[in-house]
Amino acid sequence: MRRTRRPRFVLMNKMDDLNLHYRFLNWRRRIREIREVRAFRYQERFKHILVDGDTLSYHGNSGEVGCYVASRPLTKDSNYFEVSIVDSGVRGTIAVGLVPQYYSLDHQPGWLPDSVAYHADDGKLYNGRAKGRQFGSKCNSGDRIGCGIEPVSFDVQTAQIFFTKNGKRVGSTIMPMSPDGLFPAVGMHSLGEEVRLHLNAELGREDDSVMMVDSYEDEWGRLHDVRVCGTLLEYLGKGKSIVDVGLAQARHPLSTRSHYFEVEIVDPGEKCYIALGLARKDYPKNRHPGWSRGSVAYHADDGKIFHGSGVGDPFGPRCYKGDIMGCGIMFPRDYILDSEGDSDDSCDTVILSPTARAVRNVRNVMYLHQEGEEEEEEEEEEEDGEEIEPEHEGRKVVVFFTRNGKIIGKKDAVVPSGGFFPTIGMLSCGEKVKVDLHPLSG
């Protein structure tokens, strides 16, 4: 019996199918490898840094450098980023700049070749070496450091890199453009340091509005976990515990010339833990106004007044979005001034708001009341035979608070040495307030 031979072309077709199958498998494996390589290539790198969303915090032992490198380089379409200093920590050794893709994470940005960085602790620029040159001012909590590449640099092999502080240009430098691009980097070097990273930040134009923002910043003597934007204060802290207080304290204390200020709640945030009041100049940055000695404050969330204690007393109504809270001092006529240049010239100030009119009326009533009782007070002092404590003599005042133009209450207080400074505290995420430190001036 004769065997039937299979056609040769059938065997060849099966071999072709088998080869195609293996080629397809190899192709799929190759695609997977390419994707893995690309995923690894565009992956953020960090060491001794704790990353929580856009928040970076130092997570090393004392003396160890912490370094973070973003996953993608700056491009012509995205040529700028910013870093907000949430907490400057023990030494404030925070660096912001640009580095090559595989930069060593054991060194601060700017220390090694082909990298550059602006260092917050000394205001110096480090450009490829561990020795920096004076570049700008030092940066603290609440400040924003920006870094970018001029768009024209992407068309050539030389990068013109510029830095900003709080939206205003500080200076620029030139360095070679790395083949893989220059990546945003943040360095830290001491306990407690924490920043917020804004990779999609935009640099606004330096116009009159920027100059106005800078002038408002000059009114503040201390800022902790608070950002200033014109008259607006924004909370930048974590809002997770009672020590995450954002504090803003005015540069100058209240006086007989400027004795009142106001705060409007723009955004109550998560809990509306907003407080305004008065505090001594060296008031702790992690304590809400009113909680520690040398301070008194009205708290929006519960309507209580706190006077040098963590326990408040019922005082007034709660405050919500859109409410205007005010605080001022009624100075007696025998008040001992800190400086000879201060006088009660504020009687002739121009009144601009209902709140201000109410404040003026209360002040006048107080003076009239005081003049009518001066003789009685002197007689009582003679009968009692008691002397006023030296540190209290001539320093006693009445602190008052307002809500939407109405005075809601008063509190006797003794002005600490150096004066009572307008102080605002915030303690929950999203809180924003608008401040007017001089509502009685016209």
Curated annotation (Swiss-Prot):
Residue segments, region Disordered: 371-394
Ranges of biased composition (kind: Acidic residues): 372-390
Domain of life of the source: Eukaryota
InterPro entries, per database record: B30.2/SPRY (IPR001870), B30.2/SPRY_sf (IPR043136), ConA-like_dom_sf (IPR013320), SPRY_dom (IPR003877), SPRYD3_SPRY (IPR035783), Ubq-SigPath_Reg (IPR050618)
Disulfides per UniProt: none
One Pfam family cited in the UniProt record for this chain: SPRY
Domain B30.2/SPRY: 17-204
Designated name of the protein: SPRY domain-containing protein 3
Originating organism: Homo sapiens (Human)
Gene name tied to this protein: SPRYD3
